[in-house]
From Swiss-Prot:
Family: Belongs to the PetM family.
Transmembrane spans: 11-29
Taxonomic placement: Bacteria, Bacillati, Cyanobacteriota, Cyanophyceae, Oscillatoriophycideae
Subcellular location: Cellular thylakoid membrane
GO biological process, one term: photosynthesis
Purpose: Component of the cytochrome b6-f complex, which mediates electron transfer between photosystem II (PSII) and photosystem I (PSI), cyclic electron flow around PSI, and state transitions.
Predominant place of localization: membrane
Pfam families per record: PetM
Protein name according to UniProt: Cytochrome b6-f complex subunit 7
Organism encoding this protein: Microcystis aeruginosa (strain NIES-843 / IAM M-2473)
Length: 37
């Protein structure tokens, strides 16, 4: 495994984690907002 492929995989993992985190946060906000109303 070369350094370039490790860097590439790391970038993909980071992007996926950010997207999942945003989706999860958005979901929690919608759920909390629904309960508050």
């Amino acid at each position: 495994m070369t350094a370039e492929s490790m860097l590439f995989n790391g970038a993909i993992v980071a992007i996926v984690l950010v997207l999942v985190g945003l989706a999860w946060g958005f979901l929690l906000l919608k759920i909390q907002g629904g309960e508050a109303e």
